[in-house]
């Protein structure tokens, strides 16, 4: 039997058995520049000259501003946590919490609670920030957190404090601004911008800067001068 025929036969057997290559843990991440609405999984490193040049052009569009204070900030200013009621963003209104939507988007071998097609109880995550695989179970929920690429507290200081409530709810639940990652790494990031924090995995940093810029441009959100310089540096 030829190699190609064998691969096709094995692939067919897996499909009959109810599996896909993604469920077996194959990489699924796509490039940020090819994922403008955030509905495709993960972050793929940006390595080619053309892609890096496109990344620099995008980051160059981000406005620079001065940060304001944290006065008046609390999480509820951005709506109920993981609400399905955001307007104008993918997945909203599908009956599932935003967190579960994102776990299902980025996880492989996803398993749901019995009787539910929403509540994710197990999956394997290829963590874009560390490059490590995490075998996640809901009983250890803290091991995977959904990161706001542009932290909500950062957004508040950079202008979201003046936004209508509905716009804050959108950025808090927009899949473009959300990545399931290592819980410990997300805790270490906190509300920091790119000048203060970047993913430990160096090869993903340009892609991270692009995703940060995509969110900033979409919501017309300014970043600090230091953050813009740091973002550009990752892709040059």
Go through each PLM region and give its residues.
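Generic surface-pattern signal
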Residues: 60-67, 78, 108, 214-217, ...
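Compositionally biased, low-hydrophobicity segments enriched in charged and small polar residues
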Residues: 48-52, 118-121, 178
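Secreted/periplasmic proteins that engage bacterial cell-wall peptidoglycan
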Residues: 65-145, 149-150
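Domain-level detector of nuclease and nuclease-like folds
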Residues: 120, 128-236
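Secretory targeting and sorting signals
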Residues: 1-24
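N-terminal module-boundary/linker segments of secreted carbohydrate-active enzymes
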Residues: 22-92, 96, 227
